[in-house]
Amino acid sequence: MADLAKIVDDLSSLTVLEAAELSKLLEEKWGVSAAAPVAVAAAAGGAAAAVVEEEKTEFDVILVEAGANKINVIKEVRAITGLGLKEAKDLVEAAPKAVKEGVNKAEAADIKKKLEDAGAKADVK
């Protein structure tokens, strides 16, 4: 059993490149291919990605359009992002553009409401 623990320790210390090289050497030595298990793992990964999408916890707030009250929207973007005046103006003029990324659902809804109250059209994705 001590030999297995040593092997695990040795394998854990390999870099990614060394692990890939080891995989190729074992394929050659044993006459097998790792292609089939990789395809199965990729299919399983796709199913896992679908589950993750349903349980989305991070959202992006997108400024779709500045609207008629562009100055108020620029002020609100500055308050939300902490950007300077020029950067906030550039962001507003480049709409559609992400104002805030990777925020929780409540914060995203709050930011969207603030932008809409300032006269902009915003979206949460």
UniProtKB/Swiss-Prot annotation:
Disulfide bonds: none annotated. The lineage of its organism: Bacteria, Pseudomonadati, Pseudomonadota, Alphaproteobacteria, Hyphomicrobiales. Homodimer. Part of the ribosomal stalk of the 50S ribosomal subunit. Forms a multimeric L10(L12)X complex, where L10 forms an elongated spine to which 2 to 4 L12 dimers bind in a sequential fashion. Binds GTP-bound translation factors. One of its GO terms (molecular function) is structural constituent of ribosome. Keywords: Ribonucleoprotein, Ribosomal protein. It comes from the Bacteria. It holds the Pfam family Ribosomal_L12. The keyword Ribonucleoprotein applies. The keyword Ribonucleoprotein applies. CDD domains: Ribosomal_L7_L12. Coiled coil: none annotated. This is Large ribosomal subunit protein bL12. HAMAP family: Ribosomal_bL12 (MF_00368). GO terms for cellular component: cytosolic large ribosomal subunit. GO terms for biological process: translation. Forms part of the ribosomal stalk which helps the ribosome interact with GTP-bound translation factors. Is thus essential for accurate translation. Belongs to the bacterial ribosomal protein bL12 family.
